[in-house]
From Swiss-Prot:
GO terms for molecular function: dGTPase activity. Residues 55-181 form the HD domain. GO terms for biological process: dGTP catabolic process. Pfam families: HD (PF01966). This is Uncharacterized protein MG461 homolog. SUPFAM superfamilies: HD-domain/PDEase-like. It comes from the Bacteria.
């Protein structure tokens, strides 16, 4: 097989070279191909019409960034098998995403606060990695599926000697975040993500400390790292946590709350959408996603989901469900209102809820979950490491005044934490 490459508007091209061309067999699996029909931004495209790019292109982008990182001289001492394991983990890291991407994870939650409960896409990804045909493809190329799964799912145990591998895929500055910030900014038409990723890659170093490899960034790269963190913060403010998108996602949370109640009363029919029923019915009955659902899950994508909602809207005789689906499909009737304090929010919630018949389907409290500006605070091993001109090693939080003051600057006086989401009367 010759080299395989894709043209890409963000990175120029995605290349499967002589060392990695076997990984194209993973791209051709059904689990990976379905990502062509899973939008990267879920339902945000309702408000950012250009944002219809997919998990497929993003996953290829993450692979390509990792390939370029690992081909730099800094990573020359690293064993080729380790490099290929990182590349595979980057390529496959999102194959467990459901229709509507992250939004799906809250549809079956008890409360609409983006807390993962019954469906966690990282766990589903690891199920795919440890199932056929992906498992056999990896083993045939001397790649350990369990290590790949551990790199993707942070809840899985990882040897300290392999922390550097996970950092390239999941950290405050990793290939995943590099690609989605660049890609999402480009396709939504925003200008936040002016990230000099090429220089960041050149300034990365892989150094042995006490016998264990660690990732370092040269200190002259500090302004680029700070810009990267600010960019991510602004993207969450303006794109990922857009109030209209939250309202739309919670509109569908209400839809599934109503479906759940109808299922409990044996009054709901999936109208022939068998694969969707095989995945959603257990979740509606509070059963955690498991391996036996994979054959049905791999058939689901955004188009199946949308077809289901349209069919349900046209056929349902339930007035509440009809009203909720009309809002989602035709003209969004849900709004979000933010409050300065929890007490103000709760008081207004009680006042507004009294105006609704069947209020639990039309108004809810919502606690906006802010992403941390710098998550390295949570664990010393997750800190971004800086290598000074004097060849000394330090942590980003010790050298960056911006990171030191990030909570004060970005979160202590946040005005958009407490909210109500409600159907407009």
């Amino acid at each position: 097989m010759q080299q395989i490459f894709f043209k890409d508007p963000i990175l120029g091209e995605v290349l499967f070279d002589q060392q990695t061309k076997w990984m194209y067999e993973l791209v051709e699996t059904e689990a990976f191909r379905r990502l062509r029909n899973i939008k990267q931004l879920g339902i945000n495209f309702h408000f950012y019409p250009g944002g219809v790019h997919t998990r497929y292109s993003h996953s290829l982008g993450v692979y390509e960034l990792l390939r370029r990182i690992l081909n730099t001289p800094a990573f020359a001492p690293i064993d080729e098998n380790k490099k290929q394991t990182v590349l595979v983990a980057g390529l496959l890291h999102d194959i467990g995403h459901a229709p509507h991407s992250h939004a799906f994870e809250i549809y079956f939650a008890k409360a609409p606060n983006f807390k993962k409960e019954l469906f966690i896409h990282e766990e589903v990804t690891t199920l795919f990695v440890n199932s056929e045909p992906i498992k056999s493809i990896l083993k045939a190329n001397q790649i350990d599926p369990k290590l790949v799964a551990a790199l993707i799912d942070e809840n899985k145990e990882l040897k300290p000697s392999n922390y550097w591998m996970r950092q390239l895929i999941s950290s405050d500055l990793d290939a995943d975040r590099m690609d989605y910030l660049l890609r999402d900014s480009y396709f939504t038409g925003t200008s936040h993500s002016l990230i000099d990723y090429q220089t960041i890659i050149k300034e990365m170093d892989c150094v042995k400390v006490k016998g264990i490899y660690e990732i370092f960034f040269k200190d002259k790269c500090l302004p680029l790292i700070e810009n990267f963190l600010i960019t991510r913060h602004h993207m969450y403010q303006s794109i990922y946590s857009d109030g209209r998108s939250i309202s739309t996602e919670l509109n569908l949370w209400f839809v599934f709350q109503r479906i759940k109640d109808l299922v409990d009363k044996n009054q709901f029919d999936f109208n022939g959408y068998k694969t969707l029923e095989q995945v959603c019915l257990p979740l509606l009955k509070n059963e955690h996603f498991d391996k036996k659902m994979l054959p049905a899950f791999v058939k689901l994508d955004d188009y199946v989901f949308q077809s289901f909602f349209v069919n349900l809207y046209q056929t349902t005789k339930d007035k509440i469900l009809k009203k909720l689906l009309d809002s989602y499909l035709n003209s969004l009737k849900f709004e979000i209102k933010f409050y300065e304090t929890k007490e103000q929010r709760d008081l207004d919630f009680e006042k507004q809820a009294s105006k609704y018949k069947d209020a639990k389907y039309f108004i809810t409290k919502f606690n906006n979950q802010f992403k941390g500006f710098y998550e390295g605070w949570s664990s010393h091993k997750n800190e971004l490491k800086i290598k000074t001109m004097q060849n000394k090693h330090t942590n980003l939080s010790e050298i960056s005044m911006l990171v030191k003051r990030s909570n004060e600057l970005f979160f202590e006086n946040a005005l958009y934490k407490w909210a109500n989401v409600f159907y407009r009367l």
